UniProtKB/Swiss-Prot annotation:
Record flagged with keyword Cytoplasm: no
The protein's name: NAD(P)H dehydrogenase (quinone)
Uppermost EC category: oxidoreductase
The keyword Metal-binding appears for this protein: no
Lineage, uppermost ranks: Bacteria, Pseudomonadati, Pseudomonadota, Alphaproteobacteria, Hyphomicrobiales
Catalytic activity as recorded in UniProt: a quinone + NADH + H(+) = a quinol + NAD(+); a quinone + NADPH + H(+) = a quinol + NADP(+)
Pfam family, one: FMN_red
EC number, as in UniProt: 1.6.5.2
InterPro entries referenced in this protein's UniProt entry, alphabetically: Flavodoxin/NO_synth, Flavoprotein-like_sf, Flavoprotein_WrbA-like, FMN_Rdtase-like_dom, NQO
Protein backbone atom coordinates (compact mmCIF):
# COMPACT_ATOMS: atom_id res chain seq x y z
CA UNK A 1 0.00 0.00 0.00
CA UNK A 2 1.38 3.39 -1.01
CA UNK A 3 1.53 6.21 1.50
CA UNK A 4 0.44 9.48 -0.11
CA UNK A 5 0.58 13.07 1.13
CA UNK A 6 -1.71 15.68 -0.41
CA UNK A 7 0.04 18.94 0.48
CA UNK A 8 -1.66 22.18 -0.44
CA UNK A 9 -2.05 25.92 0.02
CA UNK A 10 -5.48 27.46 -0.50
CA UNK A 11 -6.48 31.11 -0.18
CA UNK A 12 -10.22 30.98 -0.79
CA UNK A 13 -10.95 27.26 -0.53
CA UNK A 14 -10.79 26.17 -4.18
CA UNK A 15 -7.53 24.26 -3.80
CA UNK A 16 -8.76 22.90 -0.46
CA UNK A 17 -11.76 21.34 -2.25
CA UNK A 18 -9.51 19.95 -4.98
CA UNK A 19 -7.12 18.54 -2.35
CA UNK A 20 -9.89 16.55 -0.70
CA UNK A 21 -10.99 15.21 -4.10
CA UNK A 22 -7.39 14.19 -4.87
CA UNK A 23 -7.22 12.43 -1.50
CA UNK A 24 -10.51 10.66 -2.16
CA UNK A 25 -9.16 9.31 -5.45
CA UNK A 26 -5.92 8.14 -3.86
CA UNK A 27 -7.89 6.31 -1.15
CA UNK A 28 -10.02 4.65 -3.83
CA UNK A 29 -6.76 3.22 -5.22
CA UNK A 30 -5.97 1.72 -1.81
CA UNK A 31 -3.45 4.29 -0.60
CA UNK A 32 -3.00 5.51 2.94
CA UNK A 33 -3.54 9.26 2.58
CA UNK A 34 -2.82 12.33 4.69
CA UNK A 35 -4.04 15.81 3.72
CA UNK A 36 -1.95 18.68 5.07
CA UNK A 37 -1.40 22.33 4.26
CA UNK A 38 1.45 24.78 4.35
CA UNK A 39 1.36 27.81 6.69
CA UNK A 40 -0.25 31.11 5.76
CA UNK A 41 2.22 33.99 5.45
CA UNK A 42 -0.26 36.86 5.16
CA UNK A 43 -0.92 38.64 8.49
CA UNK A 44 -4.21 37.43 9.97
CA UNK A 45 -5.90 40.84 9.98
CA UNK A 46 -5.07 41.33 6.30
CA UNK A 47 -6.22 37.80 5.47
CA UNK A 48 -9.54 38.38 7.26
CA UNK A 49 -10.13 41.69 5.47
CA UNK A 50 -9.39 39.94 2.18
CA UNK A 51 -11.86 37.14 3.02
CA UNK A 52 -9.27 34.35 3.04
CA UNK A 53 -10.69 30.99 4.09
CA UNK A 54 -9.02 30.61 7.48
CA UNK A 55 -11.10 27.72 8.86
CA UNK A 56 -9.33 24.94 6.96
CA UNK A 57 -9.23 21.74 8.98
CA UNK A 58 -6.11 20.17 7.47
CA UNK A 59 -3.14 20.21 9.86
CA UNK A 60 0.06 22.06 9.00
CA UNK A 61 2.78 20.00 7.38
CA UNK A 62 6.41 19.79 8.49
CA UNK A 63 9.31 19.59 6.06
CA UNK A 64 10.92 16.72 7.96
CA UNK A 65 7.92 14.42 7.40
CA UNK A 66 8.01 14.55 3.58
CA UNK A 67 10.36 11.54 3.22
CA UNK A 68 7.79 9.37 5.03
CA UNK A 69 5.61 9.28 1.90
CA UNK A 70 5.84 7.33 -1.35
CA UNK A 71 4.10 10.15 -3.23
CA UNK A 72 3.37 13.82 -2.63
CA UNK A 73 0.61 15.53 -4.58
CA UNK A 74 0.99 19.30 -4.29
CA UNK A 75 -1.79 21.86 -4.74
CA UNK A 76 -1.31 25.59 -5.17
CA UNK A 77 -3.23 28.48 -6.69
CA UNK A 78 -1.58 30.33 -9.54
CA UNK A 79 0.22 33.57 -8.78
CA UNK A 80 1.26 35.27 -12.02
CA UNK A 81 1.95 31.91 -13.65
CA UNK A 82 3.85 30.52 -10.68
CA UNK A 83 3.08 28.79 -7.39
CA UNK A 84 1.87 30.84 -4.42
CA UNK A 85 4.57 32.29 -2.16
CA UNK A 86 3.27 30.25 0.77
CA UNK A 87 4.07 27.01 -1.06
CA UNK A 88 7.39 28.36 -2.35
CA UNK A 89 8.37 29.36 1.19
CA UNK A 90 7.68 25.81 2.39
CA UNK A 91 9.63 24.24 -0.47
CA UNK A 92 12.55 26.62 0.07
CA UNK A 93 12.99 24.93 3.45
CA UNK A 94 13.61 21.51 1.88
CA UNK A 95 17.31 22.08 1.17
CA UNK A 96 18.30 19.61 3.87
CA UNK A 97 16.17 16.94 2.22
CA UNK A 98 17.78 17.75 -1.13
CA UNK A 99 21.25 17.38 0.38
CA UNK A 100 20.35 13.89 1.62
CA UNK A 101 18.48 12.87 -1.54
CA UNK A 102 15.54 12.13 0.73
CA UNK A 103 12.90 12.55 -1.99
CA UNK A 104 14.74 10.80 -4.84
CA UNK A 105 12.44 8.26 -6.47
CA UNK A 106 9.29 9.52 -4.74
CA UNK A 107 6.32 10.36 -6.97
CA UNK A 108 5.52 14.07 -7.33
CA UNK A 109 2.40 15.56 -8.88
CA UNK A 110 0.74 19.00 -8.95
CA UNK A 111 -2.77 20.47 -9.24
CA UNK A 112 -3.71 24.14 -9.37
CA UNK A 113 -6.32 26.86 -9.80
CA UNK A 114 -6.43 30.24 -11.51
CA UNK A 115 -8.85 33.11 -11.94
CA UNK A 116 -9.31 32.56 -15.68
CA UNK A 117 -8.88 29.91 -18.34
CA UNK A 118 -5.66 31.57 -19.45
CA UNK A 119 -4.43 32.51 -16.00
CA UNK A 120 -1.24 30.45 -15.98
CA UNK A 121 -2.36 26.99 -14.86
CA UNK A 122 0.04 25.10 -17.10
CA UNK A 123 3.02 27.38 -16.42
CA UNK A 124 2.37 27.07 -12.68
CA UNK A 125 2.49 23.28 -12.83
CA UNK A 126 5.49 23.23 -15.17
CA UNK A 127 7.50 25.65 -13.01
CA UNK A 128 6.56 23.57 -9.95
CA UNK A 129 7.92 20.50 -11.76
CA UNK A 130 11.37 22.11 -11.78
CA UNK A 131 11.50 21.93 -7.99
CA UNK A 132 10.40 18.29 -8.01
CA UNK A 133 13.00 17.37 -10.62
CA UNK A 134 15.74 18.95 -8.51
CA UNK A 135 14.62 16.62 -5.72
CA UNK A 136 14.81 13.62 -8.07
CA UNK A 137 11.10 12.94 -7.91
CA UNK A 138 9.18 10.98 -10.55
CA UNK A 139 6.65 13.30 -12.20
CA UNK A 140 3.07 12.18 -12.79
CA UNK A 141 0.35 14.30 -14.39
CA UNK A 142 -3.24 13.79 -15.50
CA UNK A 143 -3.21 11.57 -18.62
CA UNK A 144 -5.65 11.94 -21.48
CA UNK A 145 -7.13 8.63 -20.32
CA UNK A 146 -9.16 11.04 -18.18
CA UNK A 147 -11.71 12.14 -20.77
CA UNK A 148 -12.79 15.16 -18.73
CA UNK A 149 -10.08 17.38 -20.17
CA UNK A 150 -11.32 16.99 -23.73
CA UNK A 151 -13.92 19.16 -25.44
CA UNK A 152 -14.80 22.85 -25.42
CA UNK A 153 -18.49 22.79 -24.54
CA UNK A 154 -17.96 24.29 -21.09
CA UNK A 155 -15.51 26.33 -19.06
CA UNK A 156 -13.21 23.86 -17.34
CA UNK A 157 -9.74 23.30 -16.03
CA UNK A 158 -7.60 20.14 -16.24
CA UNK A 159 -4.70 19.43 -18.58
CA UNK A 160 -2.20 16.61 -19.05
CA UNK A 161 0.04 18.45 -16.57
CA UNK A 162 -2.45 18.14 -13.74
CA UNK A 163 -5.96 18.74 -12.49
CA UNK A 164 -7.06 22.35 -12.19
CA UNK A 165 -10.03 24.58 -11.57
CA UNK A 166 -11.01 28.09 -12.61
CA UNK A 167 -12.12 30.33 -9.76
CA UNK A 168 -13.10 33.52 -11.67
CA UNK A 169 -11.61 36.87 -10.76
CA UNK A 170 -13.70 37.28 -7.62
CA UNK A 171 -13.40 33.64 -6.54
CA UNK A 172 -17.11 33.05 -7.01
CA UNK A 173 -16.82 30.01 -9.29
CA UNK A 174 -16.39 26.78 -7.35
CA UNK A 175 -14.70 23.63 -8.72
CA UNK A 176 -17.06 21.93 -11.15
CA UNK A 177 -17.94 18.22 -11.03
CA UNK A 178 -15.65 17.53 -13.99
CA UNK A 179 -12.75 19.39 -12.35
CA UNK A 180 -13.25 17.44 -9.12
CA UNK A 181 -13.41 14.24 -11.18
CA UNK A 182 -10.03 15.20 -12.67
CA UNK A 183 -8.62 15.68 -9.19
CA UNK A 184 -9.93 12.28 -8.08
CA UNK A 185 -8.51 10.66 -11.21
CA UNK A 186 -5.11 12.24 -10.57
CA UNK A 187 -5.17 10.96 -7.00
CA UNK A 188 -5.98 7.42 -8.16
CA UNK A 189 -3.37 7.57 -10.92
CA UNK A 190 -0.59 8.81 -8.64
CA UNK A 191 -1.43 6.30 -5.91
CA UNK A 192 -1.38 3.44 -8.41
CA UNK A 193 2.03 4.41 -9.78
CA UNK A 194 3.43 5.02 -6.30
CA UNK A 195 2.30 1.56 -5.19
CA UNK A 196 4.08 -0.03 -8.15
CA UNK A 197 7.29 1.91 -7.52
CA UNK A 198 7.21 1.19 -3.80
CA UNK A 199 7.07 -2.52 -4.65
Amino acid sequence: MAKVLVLYYSTYGHIEQMAHAVAEGAREAGAEVDVKRVPELVPEDVARKSHFKLDQSAPLARVDELPNYDAIIFGTPTRYGNMASQMKNFLDQTGGLWMKGALVGKVGSVFTSSASQHGGQESTILSFHTVLLHHGMVLVGLPYAFQGQLGVSQVMGNSPYGASTIADGDGSRQPSPIELDGARYQGRHVAGIAAKLAG
